[in-house]
């Protein structure tokens, strides 16, 4: 359906580039399913992310061109082109969601395995604890239990502080990353706008150049006609009896000199 839409050459070129990127994304995700190595999967995902970023830029450029040509198209054509734009946006969003799924799966695979080898522990065994407890009085047992509880409470408090500090650092890092992401988004949008303006300016310069060349040709042709007319007028004035040159319409030939007949009086009588 999209190939039969009435598009300008500029819109058709952008639309073709977007469709090429979509085909590359589909093939890339199919290859990703066959890759088992995590490092190669990460590299493949980075390449697909770059293609999705380029797709996003092209969709924005397609939207700008569509708005620029909206006044020259019929309402029906504008509706069809807008529907095609929404379809491309949905397709791009589906690839973005698929990328997030693969990123989550890849992150779950990166789990470190610890070797829990059997070794000599520095903690006393249960048998040793029973022997020590049997030799202690009740007050000593209470004091030892309170000391162990205090140590446990202190360890829990230290763990809470570490968790709070980690959350604070994570929140600050997320805020910084969000600010940097927003700034990069604004920079990308600004660059897209500049690129679009440069293309429009180039098209305008080409159009002006064609108009100037046409005007020069017309002026040169008119100049040759004027020179020819002036040359014919000069030749007719200098040599009025030249029959090889036809008279110019609207230009009367030079008046003949009058010849008066002189008669003598007696001849007249």
From Swiss-Prot:
Protein known as: Novel plant SNARE 13
Cellular localisation: Membrane
Family per record: Belongs to the novel plant SNARE family.
SMART domains: t_SNARE
Gene3D superfamilies referenced in this protein's UniProt entry, alphabetically: 1.20.5.110
Coiled coil (UniProt feature): 33-94
Protein's job: Vesicle trafficking protein that functions in the secretory pathway.
Entry's transmembrane regions: 218-238
SUPFAM superfamilies the record matches: SNARE fusion complex (SSF58038)
Gene Ontology molecular function terms on file: SNAP receptor activity
Annotated PANTHER family: T-SNARE COILED-COIL HOMOLOGY DOMAIN-CONTAINING PROTEIN (PTHR21230:SF79), VESICLE TRANSPORT V-SNARE PROTEIN VTI1-RELATED (PTHR21230)
Assigned keywords, A-Z: Coiled coil, Membrane, Phosphoprotein, Protein transport, Transmembrane, Transmembrane helix, Transport
Residue intervals of the t-SNARE coiled-coil homology domain: 146-208
Membrane-related topology note: Single-pass type IV membrane protein
Residue ranges annotated as Vesicular topological domain: 239-269
Gene Ontology BP annotations: protein transport
């Amino acid at each position: 359906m999209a190939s039969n839409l009435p598009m300008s050459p500029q819109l058709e070129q952008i639309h073709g580039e977007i469709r090429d990127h979509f085909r590359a994304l589909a093939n890339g995700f199919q290859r990703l399913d066959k890759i088992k190595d995590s490092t190669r999967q990460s590299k493949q995902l980075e390449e697909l992310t770059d293609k999705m970023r380029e797709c996003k830029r092209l969709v924005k450029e397609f939207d700008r061109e569509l708005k620029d040509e909206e006044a020259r198209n019929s309402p029906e054509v504008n509706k069809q082109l807008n529907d095609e734009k929404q379809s491309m946006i949905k397709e791009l969003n589906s690839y973005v969601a698929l990328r997030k799924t693969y990123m989550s799966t890849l992150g779950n695979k990166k789990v470190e395995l610890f070797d829990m080898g059997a070794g000599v522990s520095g903690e006393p065994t249960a048998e040793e604890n029973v022997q020590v407890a049997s030799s202690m009085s009740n007050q000593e047992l209470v004091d030892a239990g309170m000391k162990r509880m205090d140590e446990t409470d202190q360890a829990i408090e230290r763990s809470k502080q570490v968790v709070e500090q980690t959350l604070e650092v994570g929140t600050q890092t997320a805020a910084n990353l969000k600010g940097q992401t927003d700034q990069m988004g604004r920079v990308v949008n600004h660059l897209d706008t500049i690129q679009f303006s440069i293309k429009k300016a180039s098209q305008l310069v080409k159009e002006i150049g064609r108009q100037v060349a046409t005007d020069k040709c017309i002026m040169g042709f008119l100049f040759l006609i004027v020179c020819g007319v002036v040359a014919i007028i000069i030749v007719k004035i200098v040599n009025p009896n030249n029959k090889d040159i036809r008279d110019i319409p609207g230009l009367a030939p030079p008046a003949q000199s009058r010849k008066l007949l002189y008669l003598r009086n007696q001849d007249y009588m």
